[in-house]
């Protein structure tokens, strides 16, 4: 029987949004490649996911994903604004975009936590300021017919 316990872990460091694929030329032929910053971040995501899975089998059915994206507070913020940011009363309207971080997390977990990110049928995603930057990830396997 499949292990239906949720998997929870944190991807440390400043969150990075998924970069657009770039096109370069190799021996006269166009070649697409993922930007190095994106590839490095997806590697960190995969490593964090592997540690959390601890040898468990990949989820094969539908999953719910919860992402809590914490961005560092800019040094230029006043003490008053920093306190508001940490209290959740000031929201980060700066890069990286929430959806691009979400894409990077999903792609980094392909073949690590689930077979493919098409299995994500429900997501709860938020972006906030935090003392420690990073992304808290929770993946919950769903049973067929479960909402």
Where are the predicted features?
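Acidic, proline/glycine-enriched N-terminal capping motif
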Residues: 1-147
